[in-house]
Swiss-Prot record:
Serine/threonine-protein phosphatase that dephosphorylates a myriad of proteins involved in different signaling pathways including the kinases CSNK1E, ASK1/MAP3K5, PRKDC and RAF1, the nuclear receptors NR3C1, PPARG, ESR1 and ESR2, SMAD proteins and TAU/MAPT. Implicated in wide ranging cellular processes, including apoptosis, differentiation, DNA damage response, cell survival, regulation of ion channels or circadian rhythms, in response to steroid and thyroid hormones, calcium, fatty acids, TGF-beta as well as oxidative and genotoxic stresses. This is Serine/threonine-protein phosphatase 5. Signal peptide: none annotated. It comes from Oryctolagus cuniculus. It is an enzyme of class 3 (hydrolase). Autoinhibited. In the autoinhibited state, the TPR domain interacts with the catalytic region and prevents substrate access to the catalytic pocket. Allosterically activated by various polyunsaturated fatty acids, free long-chain fatty-acids and long-chain fatty acyl-CoA esters, arachidonic acid being the most effective activator. HSP90A and probably RAC1, GNA12 and GNA13 can also release the autoinhibition by the TPR repeat. Activation by RAC1, GNA12 and GNA13 is synergistic with the one produced by fatty acids binding. Inhibited by okadaic acid. One of its GO terms (molecular function) is protein serine/threonine phosphatase activity. One of its GO terms (biological process) is peptidyl-serine dephosphorylation. It is found in: Nucleus; Cytoplasm; Cell membrane. Belongs to the PPP phosphatase family. PP-5 (PP-T) subfamily.
Length: 42
């Protein structure tokens, strides 16, 4: 499990959120880098 805190509003009231991890997709590292370079994004 993991969690994060979101501070909202002018009083910075904390909201606590918990979630469970999901498996990463089976994608090679830097698989999208070539497409992004062609678009001039990076």
């Amino acid at each position: 499990k993991a969690s994060y805190i979101h501070l909202r509003g002018s009083d910075l009231r904390p909201q606590f959120h918990q979630f469970t991890a999901v498996p990463h997709p089976n994608v090679k590292p830097m698989a999208y880098a070539n497409a992004l370079l062609q678009l001039g994004v990076m």
